[in-house]
Amino acid sequence: MEAPTYSSKQVAEMLGVSPKQIPEESRKDAYTPDDIWELRATLDRFPERLGHRRQLFLNFKGGTGKTSLSTSYAWRLAELGYAVLLIDLDSQGHATKCLGYEGEDFEKTLLDVLVRKTPLAKVIQKSSLPNLDFVPSNLTMSTVDLALMPMAGREFKLRNALKEVEAQYDVVVFDAPPSFGLLNLNALMAANDLFVPVLADFLSFHGLKLLFETVQSLEEDLNHVLDHVFIVVNSFNATFKLAKEALEALQTHYPEFLLPTIIRQCTKFAQASSEGRPVFVADPSSKGANDIQAMIDNVLPRLVAAAAAAPAKGNQQAG
């Protein structure tokens, strides 16, 4: 995907300034991502520190719009100035495609890291944003669960692989397949935060129940406690009575995990995915883009507060 360009209004919004605060000598009709990065340095407009977050987007139920959500979320965090690594865990390579790339074009995937001990740094690719990197996926990833099966410490392979690069990123985002196996177990064991995209239908409850049972077993058996679990209602259509009833049920049964932000049904998500572009590139003024920004606005203060409450841990990771 070619690098996008931005208007002065968009740039000012990303930097948290008014357009008039952009230095006159730096003003242009259109700005590239590199231009924006230079402006950040000039104006010293970097976002608040998050520590080093590892965030997993997962639902054992398919069809929840998880990949469109995770890739647009990662893209927007990068636009806002965070250093982001997006790791595609799905052998279908949909997250890779949403960034405008074909997984088959890459020789190495996470399989090489977890099974063949290739350093993660050798698999990481650059995107069209200077501060958004990604690990691609393709059909070779379909064998990773089987390959991990006989290995000692198999559930910790991903967590250990991240240690060599984690200090370079504010956020690592995992886009996981809708299944439970050793790869997703690795992702759960590596994650600080779990995002669970759900549809407002009653079929989602079964998947949620199974996922929360898995999270609880990780706490009890492997002593791994997630910092945050965020349930995100995706593709919501308020004109459907059943959708409203399902939302009310989610609010009743999962109030402590359910984000107040709702991602409304938006055709731009499907269009953007088919074009190999995040929704913030396809249509930055769409409902989908606005709702993901609202979700980020809701989540970031919690992450900033968590980082501030654990300075010793953050300093240790940064070193």
Question: Where on the chain are the PLM-derived regions?
Answer:
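Conserved catalytic-core segment of NTP-binding enzymes
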Residues: L80, E166-A167, V171-T267
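Short helix-start
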Residues: E24-E48
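P-loop/Walker-type NTP enzyme "switch/lid" segment
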Residues: N59, A83, L89-A167, L222, ...
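C-terminal lobe/tail of nucleotide-utilizing enzymes
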Residues: A3-T5, K9, D221-G319
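Walker A/P-loop phosphate-binding motif and the immediately C-terminal alpha-helix
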Residues: G51-G93, K97-L99
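Polyanion-binding surface elements
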Residues: M1-I22
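Short, well-ordered amphipathic alpha-helices
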Residues: L39-T42, Y73, L158-R159, F212-E219, ...
